[in-house]
Amino acid sequence: MSRPRRRGRDIHGVLLLDKPQGMSSNDVLQKVKRIYNANRAGHTGALDPLATGMLPICLGEATKFSQYLLDSDKRYRVIARLGQRTDTSDADGQIVQERPVTFSAEQLASALETFRGDIEQIPSMYSALKYQGKKLYEYARQGIEVPREARPITVYELLFIRHEGNELELEVHCSKGTYIRTIIDDLGEKLGCGAHVTYLRRLTVSKYPVDRMVTLEHLQTLVAQAEQQGVPAAQLLDPLLMPMDSPASDYPVVNLPLTSSVYFKNGNPVRTTGAPLKGLVRVTEGEDDKFIGMGEIDDEGRVAPRRLVVDYPA
């Protein structure tokens, strides 16, 4: 029996999309997938509809390595409205409490300090975390509050930008799993006035260059240009993609000779020189350093395959 025909293109890489405000991460993901006519696509860490900024979208085989971006650090710029608390901790929610803003500059500085470093955070009910197989925001929309455990996070930097009237602007560099809305809500309670997010922009994810971000409008413009020029849209779109192994760029590289990579790609651990003593590694083959997957150093010092790239026929 012949294999079913694959729909769309076998295109592999990571697009750094500048997500627009007012759209869900899944909505923009589906638009990018259609624009690229890609077989597979997935994003790495959803942004709220209110938020804008860097949303890495993995296409094709790059989706196998998206988990490594979920685990990476991120940087945000956030503006909070002081004096009002909402049920979602952002401007999309309903105001549930209003209080005067009376704190001093010293009290603000002291409160901000408590959010720096290793802290614990109780996730918002309006999050995609699951409880008994159901997303928290689904419970919240039904008016049901369920128990949530505090989770360890790290805030590497919490920079004060400005405080004007009832607006507070901050920049946050944080670890995976950090909810900026929750930081703002908790900060508002610590200051005694309440607060919610009115503006949120993700500035960076991992070490991806900011100047490689593109908008949906730019992608659509390139498609129109390609049509006018009589060339395939892929000719203008594909150069925008980052390499498929870029989500795992923080991991060391182990290069295998072609004689060893054959065994590795067949699921077998192989011995090689220059490998670290333990941990995950990016594995390449041959003199051109072609990426073939992720490996892990086993107890015998061999490189064992963990996620492999599939070579699709052209």
From Swiss-Prot:
Top-level taxon of the source organism: Bacteria
Protein name per Swiss-Prot or TrEMBL: tRNA pseudouridine synthase B
Protein source organism: Salmonella paratyphi B (strain ATCC BAA-1250 / SPB7)
Documented EC number(s): 5.4.99.25
Gene Ontology molecular function: RNA binding; tRNA pseudouridine(55) synthase activity
Keyword Chloroplast included in the entry's annotation: no
A Pfam family of this chain: TruB_C_2
Gene responsible for this protein: truB
InterPro entries: PsdUridine_synth_cat_dom_sf, PsdUridine_synth_N, PUA-like_sf, PUA_sf, tRNA_psdUridine_synth_TruB, tRNA_sdUridine_synth_fam1_C, TruB_C
List of residues binding substrate: 43, 76, 179, 200
Family: Belongs to the pseudouridine synthase TruB family. Type 1 subfamily.
PANTHER family: PSEUDOURIDYLATE SYNTHASE TRUB1, TRNA-PSEUDOURIDINE SYNTHASE
Keyword annotations: Isomerase, tRNA processing
Gene Ontology biological-process entries: mRNA pseudouridine synthesis; tRNA pseudouridine synthesis
Nuclease listed as a keyword: no
Biological function: Responsible for synthesis of pseudouridine from uracil-55 in the psi GC loop of transfer RNAs.
Catalytic activity line of the entry: uridine(55) in tRNA = pseudouridine(55) in tRNA
Active-site residues from the entry: 48 (nucleophile)
